[in-house]
Amino acid sequence: MSVTDIWVLCAPKSSAFEIQERLRSFALTPNWLPQPNTPGTVQARIAADLEDSKVASLSESMIRLGAAFEITQLSSEPSLILGHPGLGLKRLALDASGEIVIRVGQLERLLTEAGGSRSELERLIRIEKGTAWLDLLEPYRLASLRVSQLPKAV
C-alpha cells in the first residue's frame, strides 16, 4: 500500500458515473466538481492508500473512459502517472523531493536513439520527462486552483 493522490482533472460528464464506479471498487468516493476550463466536464481529487497494481488498473480504466488525470504514488518507488485522452498514459519515476528522474538505462537508450543528434536527444528527453502530458494537463490544474482561490462573498 502507498499514499496515493488521484486527481481526475477533466472527465466528460458522460463518463463520470463509470469512473465513479471504478473508484468505488477501491472503496473511494469522488466529490465531483465542475471543471472550469472545459464546460460539460467534471473533476475530483481523492487521497487513497492503494497497491501499485491497483493504481495501474485504475489508470488504465480512466484513460479508456476519456479522463485527463494525474496520480501521484508515494510508494517504495514513487511515481507520477499522467493520463490524457490524446496522448495515453505516461509513468514517470520521482525522487524523494518529487522531481522527475531519468534513470541511467533510460538515458543510455535515449543517447543511442538520438544517434548523435542534439536536437533529437532534446526531443527524446522531453518525451521521457512527459513534457507533452504536463503541458496539456497544466491548464486544468491552473483552472482548478484559480477557482478554489477566489475569495468568498460575504
Residue ranges and their predicted role:
Residues 1, 36-47:
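Short glycine-rich, basic-tinged beta-strand/loop micro-motifs
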Residues 1-32:
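Short, extreme N-terminal segment that most often corresponds to the first beta-strand
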Residues 20-22, 35, 58, 81:
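Generic alpha-helix signal with a bias toward terminal, lower-confidence helices
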Residues 46-154:
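Charged interaction segments
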